[in-house]
Amino acid sequence: MSNVKTAMDTSNEESQLSYNASTSSSCAAGKEHATTPPITPIGSPTALGMGAFAIAFTTLSMSLMEWRGAAITNAYIGNCFFTAGLGLVLVAQWELVRGNSYGHTVFGGFGLFNLAFGAINAPAFGVADAFKDDPAALSNALGYFLLVWGVFVLFFTIAAMPMNLVYTAMLGTSQITYTLLAASYFAMADEKATAGVGLKKAAGAFGFVSGLLAWYVVAHLMCQDALFFSFPLGDTSRLYARLRRNR
């Protein structure tokens, strides 16, 4: 029974949105100098964060693809402010308490994006009204906004590569979503409506894939905690550790 528990603990650590390799060596080096006091285990917020991300991304992506004619994204302002905005920011703080800087940065970054995107789309903030005489300027501004966030998510993707394939694919497809959506707004600003709609739908398709991958991670984490099995994530940590040693 103890062997099963050890295996489960190891698998659980590998599925978290964090790095463990960098801290293990420093802990080993300091073990002979000081004894670390026992730490009470803290629950992981990763499943909640992944669920919030999945809900926000899949619903928004369905609107971007205009499924059943749902092309107006303002319907998801609640998701932006609360589910994926406030929710992910709170998850990020819990990751910080657990000492997970990468998880804190990723969840916090997506949370801040959703809060900002919700404010842009909420009529109470008057963003659209400020550009009512120049809609092309609004489209250009939104294009720049999404393009810069796409750069941030690109860094998330690169940093996820030494973890596993699912996180890398999830973040990579979300980065493509930001880039294509930015291109869509730029096309709209240039009055290329057909190209703009096509790019928007393509962004929705990549966003939908990203959301499905997040749902996959949620299922993995839930089954890992509650049942006797989990889903493969395509661990890449051993490969990258071997590459580092061979440098």
From Swiss-Prot:
Subcellular localization: Endoplasmic reticulum membrane
One CC-aspect GO term: endoplasmic reticulum membrane
UniProt-annotated glycosylation sites, renumbered to this chain: N20
Record-given protein name: Acetate transporter protein patA
Originating organism: Aspergillus clavatus (strain ATCC 1007 / CBS 513.65 / DSM 816 / NCTC 3887 / NRRL 1 / QM 1276 / 107)
Transmembrane spans: 37-57, 71-91, 106-126, 141-161, 169-189, 202-222
Top-level taxon of the source organism: Eukaryota
GO molecular function: acetate transmembrane transporter activity
Topology in membrane: Multi-pass membrane protein
Statement on biotechnological application from the UniProt entry: Patulin was originally used as an antibiotic and specifically trialed to be used against the common cold, but it is no longer used for that purpose since it has been shown to induce immunological, neurological and gastrointestinal effects. Genotoxic effects of patulin with dose-dependent increase in DNA strand breaks in brain, liver and kidneys have been detected in mice. However, more recently, it has been proposed that patulin might also have anti-tumor properties.
Gene Ontology biological process: monoatomic ion transport; patulin biosynthetic process
Phylogenetic classification of the source organism: Eukaryota, Fungi, Dikarya, Ascomycota, Pezizomycotina
Entry similarity comment: Belongs to the acetate uptake transporter (AceTr) (TC 2.A.96) family.
Major subcellular location class: endoplasmic reticulum
